[in-house]
UniProtKB/Swiss-Prot annotation:
Residues 139-151 have a biased composition (Low complexity). Coiled coil: none annotated. Its main location: nucleus. Residues 156-172 have a biased composition (Pro residues). A zinc finger (GATA-type) spans 267-291, 321-345. It is found in: Nucleus. This is GATA-binding factor 2. Keywords: Activator, DNA-binding, Metal-binding, Nucleus, Repeat, Transcription, Transcription regulation, Zinc, Zinc-finger. GO terms for molecular function: DNA-binding transcription factor activity, RNA polymerase II-specific; RNA polymerase II cis-regulatory region sequence-specific DNA binding; zinc ion binding. It holds the Pfam family GATA.
Amino acid sequence: MEVATDQPRWMAHHAVLNGQHPDSHHPGLAHNYMEPTQLLPPDEVDVFFNHLDSQGNPYYANSAHARARVSYSQAHARLTGSQMCRPHLLHSPGLPWLESGKTALSAAHHHNPWTVSPFGKAPLHPAARGGSLYPGTGSSACPSSSHSSPHLFGFPPTPPKDVSPDPGPASPPSSSRLEDKDSIKYQMSLSEGMKMEGGSPLRSSLAPMGTQCSTHHPIPTYPSYVPAAHDYSSGLFHPGSLLGGPASSFTPKQRSKSRSCSEGRECVNCGATATPLWRRDGTGHYLCNACGLYHKMNGQNRPLIKPKRRLSAARRAGTCCANCQTSTTTLWRRNANGDPVCNACGLYYKLHNVNRPLTMKKEGIQTRNRKMSNKSKKNKKGSECFEELSRCMQEKSSPFSAAALASHMAPMGHLAPFSHSGHILQTPTPIHPSSSLSFGHPHHSSMVTAMG
């Protein structure tokens, strides 16, 4: 019978938390407090929030329970220390392993104001930072700092050694119910929270709140380890270091300088004044490329008289083989005596060291259709691929000219993270952004809803 009575209460309260209850804001309050007349009766609210006081500390009506809680807190502080935080599972109202709404609410709100997570962050939605759960506390300089950690990174309470909970009157149902609505509505898992934080433009409005809260917490908040946008693009790609900039103008100057230095040179062997590469002989004199290579390979100077050209096939028309007396061959060779022989007789003598027998003589010349080897095929394919790649690069090089790249890289110092232009590189955004970041596009609310 107890379950039957608790179920309609939970269903009614869950409907209010989901936003089905009409919201009416008090005109005289800056925070989003709701009229007490439109809230649930205090006896129904006590079903879920009877363990919290106005300071957010556990409240127990029975003195025996309070003494047990204090002794447990002191023992827990001695064991763990005031600087130890133990992560637990994130609270989400839609998880199937939560048996009842009462367990979810008690786990989500059982946090003290001095239990501060070093990774605590403000809620991402602007409505979640409108009011505070505990309006009467003097230490809450940041409105949503004391209960922002359960939204993304929840930690169990770790009380200090010298602090004990102060029992006080129960909190008014208006502020508790409003904060319950915000926390249930905007709780999310870790992956969703990180995705929203990386892409949501609302982080810039939350930065001043995080800086104010960092001075009041015993544990400092996690700093941003990614530099700002203007620091990132200062030395990475300077427009002057790209193609066509001042660095590329160094090449023609160097070439002209080398040409001017080599104008008075002359090869000491052949007297040439123009050569692709100047060399030196053993005494330090300049040689042209041809004479220098000849001297390096043969150890003597290159002869100035050109050697006689080999006799052409027409001039050797009357030549016949000394072995088989044939006059048609693809290549003339010489035997040991120096006499000309045909290709077949010369190869036979070279292989068997005897003269080729006349019975093997044939009227026609047998030729083979040589197949292209795999190595030459690979070399040919590689050269073709390289030529095709170079041709494609030349065709597509116009959009990536130096002027286009310089125009892309120039405004990167003040580029906003949500710009929709076609930049090659986008500036990284820090995890905790500074308040100086500005977002120039007015349609970020639709982006947040689409990403969520």
